Regions:
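N-terminal secretory signal peptides and thylakoid transit peptides that target proteins
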Residues: 7-23
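Cell-wall polysaccharide-cleaving catalytic domain and substrate-binding groove, primarily
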Residues: 46, 50-93
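C-terminal segment of N-terminal export signals and the immediately downstream linker at the start
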Residues: 3, 9, 30-60
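Hydrophobic h-region of N-terminal signal peptides that target proteins for export
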Residues: 25-29
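Long, amphipathic alpha-helical surface segments
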Residues: 10-14, 32-44, 176-182, 186-193
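Primarily short, surface-exposed interaction patches in extracytoplasmic proteins
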Residues: 68-70, 132-193
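Short, functional "switch" segments adjacent to catalytic/cofactor/reactive centers
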Residues: 78-159
Length: 193
């Protein structure tokens, strides 16, 4: 028994949705090699087994014991891991720096930031400067390989407690972060003050 089924036609809207889906899939597929280079191997790796003391220390000197930190600590030992983190300038942090490269206000001085914030219709507003600093801080805490350094930056920022929403601090906090806190986070207190 043969039944005749009506042939349904794709509406223009459904055709465009399908075309957009195919185009987006192709675009995402072409990005995979770039993301693989930035993020490394995306396969799930096993956690290294750590003794309770090492695990506690790792949690205190990082923003969370990620797989790569646990494996690195297990590989070289706690003392060597701390020494490596203290010499943070030698740690390759390319993927984090690449993510931060989209922020345009992080490397500007106070006069430039004030000018950016005061200009009308220039693509920036008063919230651009503090928002970029907040986003950059979170990215560094989550993705930087310089975890001890970022913990100390957070400690000193919290200690000196410059409220970013108060007065001129909305742009001066970015300068404080780059020129004072980040520059001296693992240095002497005298240089920091």
């Amino acid at each position: 028994l043969i039944t005749n089924y009506p042939i349904t036609m794709l509406s223009r809207r459904d055709f465009l949705k399908l075309g957009a889906l195919v185009t987006a899939s192709a675009a995402l597929a072409s990005c995979a090699p770039v993301y693989r280079k930035i993020l490394g191997d995306l396969t799930i790796t096993a956690w290294a087994s750590l003794n309770p003391r090492d695990f506690m220390m790792l949690n205190r000197i990082t923003f969370g014991a990620r797989v790569e930190e646990r494996n690195r600590l297990a590989e070289i030992g706690l003392q060597n891991y701390i020494e490596e983190q203290l010499d943070f300038e030698l740690i390759d942090d390319f993927s984090c720096d690449l993510q931060l490269s989209t922020f345009k206000t992080l490397d500007k001085d106070a006069n430039e930031l004030e000018a950016i914030s005061n200009q009308l219709f220039d693509g920036y507003d008063r919230e651009t400067v503090p928002n970029e600093l907040r986003q950059a801080t979170l990215i560094r805490q989550l993705y930087s390989k310089r975890q001890l350094y970022e913990v100390m930056v957070d400690f000193w920022s919290d200690h000196f407690n410059i409220f970013i929403e108060k007065g001129e601090c909305f742009y001066l906090k970015t300068v404080d972060d780059s020129e004072v806190i980040r520059k001296h986070a693992l240095g002497s207190f005298h240089d920091l003050v």
